[in-house]
């Protein structure tokens, strides 16, 4: 599915989506990675080395340690809700409840959904989650995709889903679209129909961590520009087409996460964190102009010129940061006047995230070129 097809699908099915998905698509969810600890060892797990099996907390891309930092990140992103993930959040139930309660207290009508596995679902944990006002829970039946379909495990899963229904308003199942597992996924859908409200099927993707495990099982990228796996989308769409029950099945392709959900979340954050001189792109990235000086006197003189002309700028690490388009105008004017200040310059494109990851540098020529003719 391309972006246009996804947008059409969302337009036609938006009202049917779980509330967590509705907000996620709009970029309105804080992604709270509560721990990397997990009892499962799924071969398709996409977590990076810095997160997998590490007891760390991230609010979106930001490494945090406190509730206050999570609240701050939610405000910076204008978040309307939170998706609590891991690892397995229920292995750190007290921490999960602490953060959930704090976010619910800080924000009005703040929707919360949580991902976990049926093995860690029990009455005690569910009571704590209900008290913390969890709105939605999604169970990932890992055993089916690691060991194969098993009727006893499906009964176990259904019992856990029924238990969740006693405490949590919206209960669903979240799975990967493993190529050629249509029959197993269809049987799973039939088993949970009438128990779960929805089943979310994610397109399977390569990551640095799972690449070798997926490759040795014969999986291949579907094209040269995507991390998605060939056959994964076809499996998901075939399941949706062939399922005849009442359960709502939603397919979440990788391009939706990158081109729509992530983009919307970046735009939300960029609007709150962009400095006066930075430009927000249509993809939610930030553009800034950078002037680099070897001579401190040149830096001071340029700063004085900018101040005299009431141009917004900032000095960071002996570099001047300013509006990229104004920088281009300044360079052209200085070339025309043969201004004696010496510097190099470029336009920086970066994420509006806590790590301010730079994705591109566009060098700018700051001096007139001199051409010589051969004689």
Swiss-Prot record:
Residues at which S-adenosyl-L-methionine binds: 44-46, 87
- Species source reads Methanocaldococcus jannaschii (strain ATCC 43067 / DSM 2661 / JAL-1 / JCM 10045 / NBRC 100440)
Q: Name it.
A: Putative glycyl-radical enzyme activating enzyme MJ0021
- According to its UniProt record, the EC number is 1.97.1.-
The reply on keyword Iron-sulfur is: yes
Q: What is a single molecular function from GO for this protein?
A: 4 iron, 4 sulfur cluster binding
Cofactor(s) in the UniProt record: [4Fe-4S] cluster
Q: Which InterPro entries match?
A: Aldolase_TIM, MJ0021-like, Radical_activat_CS, rSAM
């Amino acid at each position: 599915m391309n972006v246009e097809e996804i947008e059409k699908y969302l337009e036609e099915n938006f009202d049917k989506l779980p509330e967590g998905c509705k907000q996620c698509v709009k970029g309105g969810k804080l992604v709270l990675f509560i721990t990397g600890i997990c009892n499962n060892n799924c071969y398709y797990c996409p977590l990076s080395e810095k997160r997998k099996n590490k007891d760390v907390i991230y609010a979106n891309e930001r490494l945090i340690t406190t509730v206050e930092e999570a609240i701050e990140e939610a405000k910076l992103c204008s978040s309307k809700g939170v998706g609590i993930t891991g690892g397995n959040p229920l292995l750190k139930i007290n921490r999960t409840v602490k953060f959930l309660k704090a976010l619910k207290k800080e924000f009005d009508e703040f929707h919360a959904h949580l991902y976990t596995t049926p093995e860690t679902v029990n009455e005690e944990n569910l009571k704590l989650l209900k008290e913390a006002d969890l709105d939605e829970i999604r169970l990932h039946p890992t055993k089916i995709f690691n060991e194969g379909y098993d009727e006893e495990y499906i009964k176990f899963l259904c019992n856990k889903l029924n238990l969740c229904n006693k405490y949590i308003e919206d209960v669903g199942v979240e799975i990967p679209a493993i190529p050629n597992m249509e029959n197993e996924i269809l049987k799973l859908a039939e088993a949970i129909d009438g128990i779960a409200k929805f089943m979310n099927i994610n397109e399977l993707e390569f990551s640095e961590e799972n690449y070798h495990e997926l490759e040795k099982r014969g999986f291949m990228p579907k094209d040269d520009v995507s991390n998605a796996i060939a056959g994964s989308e076809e499996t998901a769409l075939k399941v949706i087409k062939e399922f005849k029950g009442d359960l709502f099945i939603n397919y979440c392709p990788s391009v939706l996460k990158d081109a729509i959900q992530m983009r919307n979340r970046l735009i939300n954050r960029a609007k709150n964190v962009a400095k006066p001189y930075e430009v927000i792109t249509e993809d939610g990235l930030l553009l800034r102009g950078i002037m680099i000086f070897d001579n401190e006197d040149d830096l001071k003189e340029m700063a004085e010129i900018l101040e005299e002309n009431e141009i917004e700028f900032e000095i960071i690490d002996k570099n001047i940061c300013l509006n990229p388009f104004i920088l281009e105008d300044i360079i052209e004017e200085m070339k025309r006047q043969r201004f004696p200040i010496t510097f190099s310059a470029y336009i920086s494109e970066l994420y509006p995230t806590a790590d301010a990851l730079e994705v591109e540098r566009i060098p700018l020529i700051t001096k007139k070129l001199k051409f010589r003719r051969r004689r």
